[in-house]
Amino acid sequence: MEPDGTYEPGIVGIRFCQECNNMLYPKEDKENRILLYACRNCDYQQEADNSCIYVNKITHEVDELTQIIADVSQDPTLPRTEDHPCQKCGHKEAVFFQSHSARAEDAMRLYYVCTAPHCGHRWTE
């Protein structure tokens, strides 16, 4: 919550009743078609400054993304190497890419995917 009582866009915080300090819950005013926050213990309600009541941010780890993108080994834009053979099938060629992870320890980690059609093994070094 900002000092002026408003909320940062995209941030959905817990709001509390100004009269009895209980939690406020989202409620629709069907007649005026607006979102309200209402107390379930007293009659206090306030108009919502934002129509968003829930934010679900999904972040994927690089390991998950290589599983989701099955064709990563066929991507012509990814660099290829023969210096890191597949540990699973022995195939010499692999595509590689750098992690875009927000974690500092993963900042320079390279991920490899075997280009053999029957394999698709993923690893990092």
Curated annotation (Swiss-Prot):
InterPro entries: DNA-dir_RNA_pol-M_15_CS, Rpa12/Rpb9/Rpc10/TFS, Zn_ribbon_RPB9, Zn_ribbon_RPB9_C, Znf_TFIIS
Domain of life according to the entry: Eukaryota
Residues carrying N-acetylmethionine: M1
UniProt record, GO biological process: maintenance of transcriptional fidelity during transcription elongation by RNA polymerase II; transcription by RNA polymerase II; transcription initiation at RNA polymerase II promoter; transcription-coupled nucleotide-excision repair
Keyword ATP-binding annotated: no
Keyword Acetylation part of the UniProt annotation: yes
Compartments it resides in: Nucleus, Nucleolus
Subunit-structure text: Component of the RNA polymerase II (Pol II) core complex consisting of 12 subunits: a ten-subunit catalytic core composed of POLR2A/RPB1, POLR2B/RPB2, POLR2C/RPB3, POLR2I/RPB9, POLR2J/RPB11, POLR2E/RPABC1, POLR2F/RPABC2, POLR2H/RPABC3, POLR2K/RPABC4 and POLR2L/RPABC5 and a mobile stalk composed of two subunits POLR2D/RPB4 and POLR2G/RPB7, protruding from the core and functioning primarily in transcription initiation. Part of Pol II(G) complex, in which Pol II core associates with an additional subunit POLR2M; unlike conventional Pol II, Pol II(G) functions as a transcriptional repressor.
Family per record: Belongs to the archaeal RpoM/eukaryotic RPA12/RPB9/RPC11 RNA polymerase family.
Designated name of the protein: DNA-directed RNA polymerase II subunit RPB9
Organism: Bos taurus
Lineage, top ranks: Eukaryota, Metazoa, Chordata, Craniata, Vertebrata
